[in-house]
Amino acid sequence: MSTPRKAAGNNENTEVSEIRTPFRERALEEQRLKDEVLIRNTPGYRKLLSASTKSHDILNKDPNEVRSFLQDLSQVLARKSQGNDTTTNKTQARNLIDELAYEESQPEENELLRSRSEKLTDNNIGNETQPDYTSLSQTVFAKLQERDKGLKSRKIDPIIIQDVPTTGHEDELTVHSPDKANSISMEVLRTSPSIGMDQVDEPPVRDPVPISITQQEEPLSEDLPSDDKEETEEAENEDYSFENTSDENLDDIGNDPIRLNVPAVRRSSIKPLQIMDLKHLTRQFLNENRIILPKQTWSTIQEESLNIMDFLKQKIGTLQKQELVDSFIDMGIINNVDDMFELAHELLPLELQSRIESYLF
């Protein structure tokens, strides 16, 4: 390698050294080749360097040159934006470091400001004007301290639990003469225990008429011709009152055991299905479909079961498979024998399914 030589110059104190070395010459040659490649691949840039006309005159001549110039411009702007992103990231990192350092030193300053604000609040209790604080933290801590001093204790009255006073009207309702016990039919006596099982630990909203069963319960017979007229009159009165009740009293009717026995009193010749039996028959279907029926709905289903019981009473001993299927089809419950089997599978437990399958299918 040749010895580096310094180019002759008039000013020896120039900042830029002009010592020519092989490495410097090689770098200059590479830069020149890169510039040539750039000019060769960008006709718009080459046109700007070679032509002496103005830029807007060049752009107005050829649309291809305008397009290439815009592409070059977009590339330059993209590179510049990337450079700006790196600078912004560095700036954000620097700001984050400054914030962390400020937060580390902040607790000590807050303690000093808090002690200073406490002293200022103690000195300015009698003054109506608030002191001028130098920072936002002083103002916040001063207000918090003043608010803590203004807390008040609230007095709570004691709770006294007392018994509900009983009136003489309720005592009068529980006393009945022996003659009243004779007016209770056997159907009501049979249906009342099942309804009572459905309403365990649920006090009625309305005051139901208590049914007192005295020692004369044993000699009661099923046929009481002297009381048939009274029972029909009571049934008609209960039906009339049930139809005239508003929506607000539906919950009271559902909790009233006397009102739930309307099907048994109205059609005493046919014994309806008990609510417990209905729940047992429909338990599987209701659990699979997650259906919860209210009490009033069960009483309605019990009333509708009288139609089926009446039909079975008329056809008892002579009921055939086809007649049963036809009757269910006429009611609109099923369409064919397969639907009846599916209905029995949904509503009946496994033991009853096997029994009805051996009889019908």
UniProtKB/Swiss-Prot annotation:
Subcellular location: Nucleus; Chromosome, Centromere, Kinetochore
Name of the protein this chain belongs to: Inner kinetochore subunit CNN1
Family per similarity comment: Belongs to the CENP-T/CNN1 family.
Induction details: Levels are constant throughout the cell cycle (at protein level).
Region (Disordered), start-end ranges: 1-22, 103-132, 193-255
One Gene Ontology term from the biological process aspect of the record: cell division
Extent of Basic and acidic residues compositional bias: 111-121
Misc. comment: Present with 1300 molecules/cell in log phase SD medium.
Residues with PTM Phosphoserine: S2, S17, S50, S52, S55, S74, S115, S135, S153, S177, S192, S268, S269
UniProt keywords, alphabetically: Cell cycle, Cell division, Centromere, Chromosome, Kinetochore, Mitosis, Nucleus, Phosphoprotein
Source domain of life: Eukaryota
GO cellular component: a single term: kinetochore
Observed effect of gene inactivation: Decreases S-phase duration and leads to mild chromosome segregation defects.
Polar residues bias locations: 122-132
Residues modified as Phosphothreonine: T14, T21, T42, T53, T86, T88, T91, T129, T134, T139, T174, T191
General function of this protein: Component of the kinetochore, a multiprotein complex that assembles on centromeric DNA and attaches chromosomes to spindle microtubules, mediating chromosome segregation and sister chromatid segregation during meiosis and mitosis. Component of the inner kinetochore constitutive centromere-associated network (CCAN), which serves as a structural platform for outer kinetochore assembly. Modulates outer kinetochore KMN network activity by regulating interactions within the network.
GO MF annotation: an example: protein-containing complex binding
Quaternary state and interactors: Component of the inner kinetochore constitutive centromere-associated network (CCAN) (also known as central kinetochore CTF19 complex in yeast), which is composed of at least AME1, CHL4, CNN1, CTF3, CTF19, IML3, MCM16, MCM21, MCM22, MHF1, MHF2, MIF2, NKP1, NKP2, OKP1 and WIP1. Interacts (via N-terminus) with the outer kinetochore NDC80 complex subunits SPC24 (via C-terminus) and SPC25 (via C-terminus); the interaction is direct and contributes to the correct spatiotemporal organization of the KMN network. Interacts with outer kinetochore MIS12 complex subunit NNF1.
Post-translational modification remark: Phosphorylation of the C-terminus by MPS1 kinase regulates interaction with the outer kinetochore Ndc80 complex. Phosphorylation levels rise from S-phase and through metaphase, the protein is thendephosphorylated in anaphase.
Biased composition (Acidic residues): 219-254
Region Interacts with the NDC80 complex subunits SPC24 and SPC25 and with the KNL1 complex, residue ranges: 60-84
